[in-house]
Amino acid sequence: MNWDEYALSIAEVVAKKSKDPWRQVGAVLLRHDNTVAACGYNGFPPHMEEDWSCRDKRRNYVVHAEQNALRHVRPLECYLLASTTLPCNDCLKSLASYGIKRIVYRETYPTDESTTLLASEFNIALINV
């Protein structure tokens, strides 16, 4: 098992913590020595009522797994994000600002083309496993 597969297997376990009935996303950040720095999953912010039945509320308030993982690291501390789903463009911008240079993921979104172009501009390698 290589480091990409290792990190992605952890992300898949972390995703199971999400209470989102439509999409459970998990993310893991690896440091330069391949130790796990942080994990995150998609969900409502702490102390907020979790109303998964309202699509608009869910879309407006849910914090993405990648953002939840980034809250626990310093910029340039990590090089790799493993996510069960390809990050959205907003998450990709945040990941670039933290110095992430490699993203491994399992599932994709319909917005893949714009995400691929943005990742290329940020010099981030996207690897679909």
Description of each model-found segment:
Residues 1-129:
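Zinc-dependent deaminase catalytic domain
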